[in-house]
Amino acid sequence: MLSYGKPFNFQRWIDEHVHLLKPPVGNQQVWQDSDFIVTVVGGPNRRTDYHDDPLEEFFYQLRGNAYLNLWIDGKRERVELKEGDVFLLPPHVRHSPQRPESGSACLVIERQRPEGTVDGFEWYCDACGERVHRVELQLKSIVNDLPPLFDAFYESEEKRRCPRCGVVHPGKQGRTD
């Protein structure tokens, strides 16, 4: 039995869901309840957090251009994703996807997390590079689990204050370049 249905035209699927690929939703999961989290993410979209995924992530930039800010060895690096590019991100590489172009679309494939495996979400100080805040959770639903975590960070000056230099992270308006 084909529990995920028959083959379909992926481009047509994207066109039919394009209204969900922009703010405030920004993404749409292709299949539910599979071993893979297959998501199409649209732009524009900017993030100030860095995701610490315990597993690999696959990116295929379908339309437009995007980039990943990476946090490696205490410094920010940038990986460009041009239309047509694919990229496999190793586990535990802190990354912050940036999709500045309206109408852009990226296929992102991740594995479902085994029970007890946690994802981390981190924010860094724009002034000195120190990690300001980290939250860990067993990720079950990107749509339901993440907004409360992000809101808790953005709404708390205490959580946004750098422990090293005292500068307050600007929250949603933080650095994304």
UniProtKB/Swiss-Prot annotation:
Substrate binds at E57, R99, E110. Fe cation 1 binds at H51, E57, H95. Binds 2 Fe(2+) ions per subunit. Signal peptide: none annotated. It comes from the Bacteria. Transmembrane segments: none annotated. Gene3D superfamilies: Jelly Rolls (2.60.120.10). It catalyses: 3-hydroxyanthranilate + O2 = (2Z,4Z)-2-amino-3-carboxymuconate 6-semialdehyde. Pfam families: 3-HAO. Its cofactor is Fe(2+). GO terms for molecular function: 3-hydroxyanthranilate 3,4-dioxygenase activity; ferrous iron binding. Its EC number is 1.13.11.6. O2 binds at R47. Fe cation 2 binds at C125, C128, C162, C165. Belongs to the 3-HAO family. PANTHER family: 3-HYDROXYANTHRANILATE 3,4-DIOXYGENASE (PTHR15497:SF1). Catalyzes the oxidative ring opening of 3-hydroxyanthranilate to 2-amino-3-carboxymuconate semialdehyde, which spontaneously cyclizes to quinolinate. Homodimer. NCBIfam families: anthran_nbaC, PRK13264.1. This is 3-hydroxyanthranilate 3,4-dioxygenase. It comes from Burkholderia cenocepacia (strain ATCC BAA-245 / DSM 16553 / LMG 16656 / NCTC 13227 / J2315 / CF5610).
